[in-house]
Amino acid sequence: QPLMEFSGACEGCGETPYIKLLTQLFGDRMMIANATGCSSIWGGSSPVTPYTTNECGQGPAWSNSLFEDNAEYGYGMYIANRTKRQHLASLVEESLAKNVGSDSLQALLNDWLEHMAEGEGTQQRATKLAAALSEEADEDPLLTKIYEQKDLLVKTSQWIVGGDGWAYDIGFSGIDHVLASG
């Protein structure tokens, strides 16, 4: 299901079909760093938004940056999320090493750890693990810490969106920096 609808963009706009497709593929775990431009007008004009959620209340997270800083802004979002998830992984590793929780919870923690870098199936693994953690989190402070960070169980899909002026001219040095960073 597309998680972008009723954008209010100009008739024939070439940007919206791409974003609609991205939301169909990644929308329930998508983070968008948007450069100021047309997409900030049709994508974030208060009091409405074209983005919506699925039946579980999951949908794209959209944020807008200054025109020239968007590549760095989006890259910063990615790095911050990656760092938080690495910390969560260290907590999961510690809980597995200490044999904390039931066998079924340990199996779910191990499965999450093995697949934490994969987008495919991340929502399903996160849902199962969060449910199991909710039942056992009070039994150990380490499980409580993991459960408190359950929003990080899903691997996000980070997107940096901008127009041609941003990509070819004003924001090029930022794009170059992000690409050079790997």
Describe these PLM feature segments.
Residues Q1-G182:
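Cofactor-binding active-site loop characterized by glycine-rich and histidine/acidic residues
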